UniProtKB/Swiss-Prot annotation:
Molecular functions per Gene Ontology: IMP cyclohydrolase activity; phosphoribosylaminoimidazolecarboxamide formyltransferase activity
Domain notes: The IMP cyclohydrolase activity resides in the N-terminal region.
Keyword terms, alphabetized: Hydrolase, Multifunctional enzyme, Purine biosynthesis, Transferase
Name listed for the protein in its UniProt record: Bifunctional purine biosynthesis protein PurH
Keyword Transferase on entry: yes
CDD domains xref list: IMPCH
Gene Ontology CC annotation, any one: cytosol
EC numbers for this chain: 2.1.2.3, 3.5.4.10
InterPro entries, A to Z: AICAR_Tfase_dup_dom_sf, Cytidine_deaminase-like, MGS-like_dom, MGS-like_dom_sf, PurH-like
SMART domains recorded: AICARFT_IMPCHas, MGS
Bilayer-spanning residue ranges: none
BP GO annotations: 'de novo' IMP biosynthetic process
Amino acid sequence: MSDKPYALISVSDKSQIESFAKGLIEAGYDLLSTGGTYRLLSDNGIAVTEVADYTGFAEMMDGRVKTLHPKIHGGILGRRGQDDAVMSEHGIRPIDLVVVNLYPFAQTVAKPDVTKADAIENIDIGGPTMVRSAAKNHEHVAIVTNPADYDVVLQELKDTGSISQKTRFDLAVKAFEHTAHYDGMIANFLGSRLESFEAPDSFARTFNVQLQKAQDLRYGENPHQKAAFYVEANGSGEGSISTAQQHQGKELSYNNIADTDAALECVKSFSESACVIVKHANPCGVAINADQTQAYKTAFSTDPESSFGGIIAFNRPLTKQTAQAIVDTQFAEVIIAPSLEQGVLDITAAKKNVRVLTCGELPSPDQRAAQFDYKRVTGGLLIQNQDLGLITADDLQVVTDLKPTAEQLNDLLFTWTVAKYVKSNAIVYGKDQRTIGIGAGQMSRVNSARIAAIKAEHANLATQGAVMASDAFFPFRDGIDNAAEVGIKAIIQPGGSIRDDETIAAANEHGIAMVFTGMRHFRH
């Protein structure tokens, strides 16, 4: 039996595997492989032994059974110096390196026409068994499950002639993370199809999600709280705070991340060029304008005091002109955009503490795939689909004698979109595709309306002739009466109150056009 180290390679993702195998041979390894991996390596002139030739047991059941054999798992699990005699007695050669990644279950079940048979056949059995065996015996065996680690392993073999205990332990932890994620995906997929495979439940019997640490944070929401930022192992792929790249500024804080997410999610909701400024997770100014710099200046003018130290988000590449306007106007904690025009960082460098981020391309509002939202409660987790509900003019029900004008209709849809991202109870005043007053987070809806009016007055913005959006229905007519007092001429709200007749009558009395959306946007 050869004394050379032995590597077992069996991969579904065959990227870089040929160069890795050649590197292992150069490092002195003999290679053992299965099925398609064996054929790929041998067809490319790489010396490799097929598992069936080593075990003396041919693959069977269409490949379902090929590595589930004592000569494989004995070689992986054997403890050097303790199980040597048993291994020798049974002709088991120690396996020192296992290179395995698993059947593409996620890719298979992502297909809209996937069948139950296809899903089941793509549940890997032998792969996870080898991965877990090697990870358990990491004192003696290295396990590689990700092609991203190939170069690390080869470099260490080149530098030291072996794979260190520290590296083996790190690879073992990655392996257990890999199999945990894999089994979680299977449980989620099948667990949502207990009643019907063709009509799955949105929520499985158990819910598994794997998060990867992106960074440790200095502290949490407050300095006495510890915190870290985790991202989903398989995110949606769209530009987000979890995909963002930081180009300058201080390290992001817990609150920076939360507020930047709020700003970016709001600005994603507009197909036109928009700017959103957020403070404490609430928009304090939003504007749409083809001229990005003007969009920023208009959003800022809604509430200059609250905008100080805020988060500024754009849904178009940040231009030099806009960057200069920000630097000249205010201090911002974070500026985020899909990308940066060349030269922007030369301008923002004047405010070296400002965090400048890019998030990558943003999808159009009607092309976003709903992800899950999570809210922690003591002893549990509330899970819901992300609120991506969209309203068009065709969805609106005019409930008053007076119909909104075309201009008012555009402003109603604009303020309705903003209201979705304001903490409830939410009231948004707007005109000409910009906010002029935002009332957020009050226990009384009419008080939110009063605050929105106060904000507008404080910023010297006229509410006369503006429109108003409410994230939920008005329970009493006082909200309509208050709107009339400050000159609101059109209102958008979900409707659905037992007193809708009273609020409609109030709007008619005041000569206000009002539309119902039939959709609520509570935000807690």
